Design a protein with these regions (language model features):
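Alpha-helical segment proximal to the catalytic Tyr-Lys
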Residues: 128, 173-177, 237
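Short, small/polar-rich loop/turn modules that mediate ligand/substrate recognition or access, typified
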Residues: 89, 176, 181, 239-241
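Residue(s) in the substrate-gating loop at a strand-loop-helix junction
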Residues: 144
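Active-site helix of classical SDR
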Residues: 123, 160, 168
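Substrate-binding pocket helix/loop in short-chain dehydrogenase/reductase
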Residues: 99-100, 104-112, 206, 210
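Conserved glycine-rich cofactor-binding loop
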Residues: 18-19
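Short C-terminal tail/terminal secondary-structure segment
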Residues: 2-3, 149, 229, 240-253
Length: 253
């Protein structure tokens, strides 16, 4: 019986794969049968992630995606070793919490270069005619609920995530003739190792306050990874140009 949710025989590229959501996306994709290409800056953590993958035939690459000039060679190297790419999950990104008066041009440039420019360039290279599966593919941008709702001192981060949400719609139209689906995943607060050490989760009282904002409680990395697996699979073949909000009900209040 055909299983439209499987990722068997698919090659999936995951950025930011050395920790947090990106790491879990890579693990979950491998569990569903995919060959996974892991990309992140930290080589040691990448290798630790690779050890947790199911199956064989995976590839890990230590690379700083803000090096836009050499992304073409990066993608060519992946395709030469793994064959055409079936899916790209752009998990790599950074955040910032600061008011407008403290936003220096170099800080703005850093966030946009990491969250937006690197994502656009990698997607451009992956979707080259010779690099992507001719039968179709799936691309996922990672935004945030901060691209949909406001929060004090989060405007810079929101600028970058809003750009991905808006751009996704036009790209989805542009690449639909080639059966390439492009969607956005916008998570709420996820209990990653980094977030667990933040005051809003580490402090018991603040954690209780934070949890009260989420009708279904705080999310786990698996919740986001499962959404990505679905969007990468053939089960989502008729979904494109969408911003999938996965936030335990935060934005419905």
């Amino acid at each position: 019986m055909n299983n439209p949710f499987t990722l068997k025989n698919k090659t999936i590229v995951v950025t930011g794969a050395s920790s947090g959501i990106g790491q879990q996306v890579a693990i979950s994709c491998s569990q569903m049968g995919a060959k996974v290409v892991l990309i992140a800056r930290n080589k040691e953590r990448l290798e630790e992630t690779k050890k947790q993958l199911s199956g064989k035939g995976h590839l890990s690459i230590s690379y700083d995606l803000t090096d836009l000039e050499h992304q073409k060679e990066l993608v060519q190297g992946i395709v030469s070793k793994m064959g055409p790419i079936d899916g790209l999950v752009n998990c790599a990104g950074i955040t910032a919490t600061l008011p407008l008066k403290l936003m220096k041009p170099e800080t703005v440039d850093e966030l946009f270069r990491t969250n937006v420019f690197a994502t656009i360039e990698l997607t451009r290279q992956v979707l080259g005619v010779k690099n992507v599966n001719k039968e179709g593919a799936s691309v996922i941008f990672f935004a945030s609920i901060m691209g949909c709702v406001g929060e004090n001192a989060k405007s810079l981060y929101s600028f970058t995530k809003g750009a991905l949400i808006s751009g996704c719609r036009s790209l989805a139209i542009e690449y639909a003739p080639r059966k390439v689906r492009i969607n956005v995943v916008s998570p709420g607060l996820i209990e990653t190792p980094i977030n667990k050490n933040q005051p809003y989760l580490a402090d018991p009282e603040k954690r209780k306050e934070t949890e009260s904002m989420y009708p279904l409680g705080l999310g786990k990395t698996e919740d986001i990874a499962n959404t990505c697996v679905f969007l990468l699979s053939d089960a989502a073949r008729w979904i494109t140009g969408q911003n999938i909000i996965v936030d335990g009900g935060y934005t419905i209040k």
